[in-house]
Amino acid sequence: YLMPGFLYTYQRFREEIEIPVVVNGDENRMQRLQRMIRPFILRRLKGEVLRDLPAKLEENVFAKLEGEQLALYDAHVQRMKESLEGKSEKEFRSEKIQILAELTRLRQICCDPGLLFEGYKGESAKAQMCMELIENAVGAGHKVLLFSQFTSMLERLAAGLKKAGIDYYMLTGSVGKEKRMQMVESFNEDDVPVFCISLKAGGTGLNLTAADIVIHYDPWWNVAAQNQATDRAYRIGQQNPVQVYKLIAQDTIEEKIVALQQAKQSLAETVTGSADGAILSMKPEELLELLEVPEP
């Protein structure tokens, strides 16, 4: 808006920059774009500003769906693929919000089918793995931040913590500002070892350096939101190395989300230093690719 025409018309930008960089991986065009925008971008990287921070170790932890959970996932994938393959381009464009809702339901099955199916009595591979990680961490004297996009999933995990005799705090969007700050102060000072936080409610503005383990229960389209959540523990005042676990349902859409995050983040960071999920801008074939499952 301040410099109209600086990056040409969209058609010219698409032909000279976007397609060569995004589709063809043209390094020369990428460097050309970098040179053009570098004078207008101010980046402050935590690794450069806070060189005395302890290490941050990130690990993807995979859980394999089995039994009834796997059957429900496969059935939902097949239904979505049949729906997408039968749509015209016009229908696809007009129904992207509904398609995104279906993808969200698929992610919920990965988390725990009980989020969708009230009568579900089977297991959740990720919930079992998450509880094992938390129990081991608490047993070793660590404090844990547990993030999920789904508040209903946090409630199910909290029930598991209660059953295991592990104390916790719970922060969702329904918690008022005063109560929120009270919980933050208490967690940093007392012996309660787990803080369950919805990603949207607690992704920014909290200082929780008493924790040195962060668990992301479900990957989200926007990796920047997850990074901001991790930074509730990995920030000024942190004295210990921070271990970050990202739980992923193996051979599912969650693996595809992580790959998409990495690809989008790599491209965006090369240009500006930020990343964002672009699910609503996907083409039908790209969405179908998200649903593909490797052959056993």
Q: What is the predicted role of each segment?
A:
Residues 1-13, 50-78, 179, 183, ...:
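SF2 helicase/translocase ATPase core recognition
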Residues 1-46:
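Conserved P-loop NTPase motor "coupling/switch" region that bridges the ATPase
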Residues 2, 32, 36, 40, ...:
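Generic recognition of well-ordered alpha-helical segments
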Residues 15-21, 162-169, 211-212, 216:
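Short glycine/proline- and charge-enriched loop/turn segments
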Residues 25-33, 41, 98, 122-129, ...:
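Soluble or luminal CAZymes and related metallo-dependent hydrolases
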Residues 37-38, 96, 146, 180, ...:
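Alpha-helical structural signal
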Residues 49-74, 87-206, 277, 283-296:
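Conserved Helicase C-terminal RecA-like lobe
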Residues 79-86:
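Cytochrome P450 catalytic domain signature, combining two hallmark sequence patches
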